[in-house]
Amino acid sequence: MDTNVENVKKKHPKGLYLVFLTGMWERFSYYGMRGILMLYLTKTFLEGGLAFDPQTASLIYGFATGLTYFTPLIGGWIADNFLGQRKAVLLGGLIMFFGEFVLFAMHSHIGLYLGLFLLIIGNGFFKPNISALVGGLYEPGDKRLDSAFSIFYMGINLGAFLAPLLTGLLTDNIFASNVTNPETGEIVMSFGYKYGFLAAAIGMLVSEVIFLLFAQKYLGDLGLHPKGGKKKVADAQVSDAPLTKEEKERITVIFVYFFFAIFFFAGFEQAGSSFTLYTDKFIDRVVGGFEIPTAWFQSVNPLFIVVLAPVFASFWNSKFGQTLTTPFKMGTGLILLGIGYFFMLGAVYERGGSIGNDPSDMAVKASLAWLVLTYLTHTMGELCLSPVGLSIVTKLSPPKLAGLLMGVWMTAAFFANAAGGVIASYVEKLGPSIVFTVISGFVILCGLGMVLLNKKLQRMMHGVK
């Protein structure tokens, strides 16, 4: 009997796989949209886009993606106090579906702003609460929890990997067509971006239907009702206790990591903005006579994560890996990000550094190997910094401030995406060689600074590893 109970405990609850599928299809929807957004913003109306200049498009992209990391703070609070996690997930998914559908149905600036607004609001309800449901499936201290989150994030990356492949195929091949410019008589390619947004909307609808049909069966009462009552009273009693000196120093360390993480992700998020525009114009994407859709390169990072995450996890758990401190790991992540920019600079200098838009200039293309090497190195940097950061914030936070400080940590991505949009807006103005060199040098210096702060930060962490 005891053996059977132990075997059951080793298995994950079926609710985890429901959340896995729900999250996977939602990320399919989001990354399908994200993979073509910069192209949609910058292509001409005749080409199926909205004809924004690259600077304006970069700012729109940066602030829109950044706000998707800010609204979960509000959506999580509303779910905890009023809606409950299940209703918040369904409401958020429904709002995001309408956001994607608006992008499909309205080829206009108004449609863009309305669609992005709905996506930002919907994501605020969906994102924090789908993750919270994973944790709610397990009792405190359950050793299966780390494995559960690994499975959940594998679903996220699977959705992020598959989505750009489909949307890129739809926009660049299946629904692309040649049209004649009525003013010049020139034949231009019109891309089917609206159908990419439709695919993203359908993906979100699939997520909603799966969750609606199976939530009661596999989640029971989990997340049905908002938290409150006794828990609020208990939290209020705990929060009256003053912070100790150790807790204050640990919180200071969290804000140091927060500061450096902003710089990392501001450089990392160029993948969706300046890298995408550079890839579309100046990278040789033809392989064996087939031109790879630009959106497909947004699948490279999640593919590398799926392949490399187990390798990094194994290394961190090895005897040598356990001797490496958190500041050293995060500093290494920043340095790897900077090194990745060396490869982008290789692409820039292979074609002479120019980013002019005349046909003779755009005919000079750089090898796609530079881009793949950039994404590989950046993914390695991400695996050094991102999961390590989430783990250490959890460990360093005083229990009464754990939720607040995790929310603060997530807002690093908001500031980083917004800053990344501003940075990307200068690529066209100053040239990629200058912007990429500055980013590379700056984040490498930040990484070295983090390593130099290693001993001091370790002392302030008071034994937390």
List each language-model region with its residue ranges:
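Short amphipathic helix-loop junctions that connect adjacent transmembrane helices
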Residues: G35-T56, A271-A295
